[in-house]
Amino acid sequence: MKKIRLALQKSGRLHDESLQILNNCGIEIQKGQNQLKVSSSNFPLEVFFLRNSDIPGYLLDNVVDIAVIGENLLHEKGEGIVVNEHLGFSKCRVSLAVPNQSNIENVSELQSKSIATSYPNTLKKFLKKHQIKAKIHVINGSVEIAPNIGLANAVCDIVSSGSTLFNNNLKEIKTILKSEAVLCSSPSIDEQRAELLNQLLFRIRGVLSAKKFKYLLMNAPADKVDRITGLLPGMKSPTVMPLADKSWVSIHTVIETDEFWNVIDLLKENGAQGILICPIDKMFV
């Protein structure tokens, strides 16, 4: 039987969070130190640990079938690669920034200026869209130093917390691209591996859905059931179960975590007691 080939970042936060989501999906990966290729013991999956910037090329050449990479890299190097699922972690942005003391306040003022970046393709598309002509200096690392050494008037680089910009006396003037980790696939994936991808996506979506919801249980007066269930923005109809005391019932439902805080006071005002919120491990809808 064929195995689906997954490319992951060799190290770093994206690597760690990618392995964590596989673990949450029940897929066992035992990686030894310095191993660049491992197989799952309970799912037809091979994992390749590669340099992040090389992964789009491996996908396009069909060396690997799927990968977890950031949208920033996909936008820069991954034209033609298929995005299958947004994963909700490793969030960042690609932004334009200038020195704090610069008179440049908006992107139109970058006309005829010089910009240092590790994302030349992303920057070129943005400048073309806004009809800005600027000189682009391509740098593979430490982009933020470029204005301080007189190489560029501005930088275009990845921003996470903003601390690197702050430490280099830079300020953001425009976000070009918002990014998070995505599961993506080769445009040439074969039919058998595409089916394995669907099985993996089913598991991943169950894990991602569970993060957004909580299981809500409460006791309520039987004569307040209609009013209380009407307050619950949960999935379909809540489960209502009788208790030993016939004047009380137990209400069970699934609710978005953020929505719960909007209704908890109303639930209590209408007689709900013993309210419990439980995490959900997986959820398939």
State what each model feature region is.
Residues 2-45, 71-82, 87-93, 101-285:
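Small-molecule-sensing regulatory modules
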Residues 39-57:
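Active-site-flanking structural segment that lines cofactor/substrate pockets
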Residues 53-58, 63-79:
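Pocket-flanking alpha-helical
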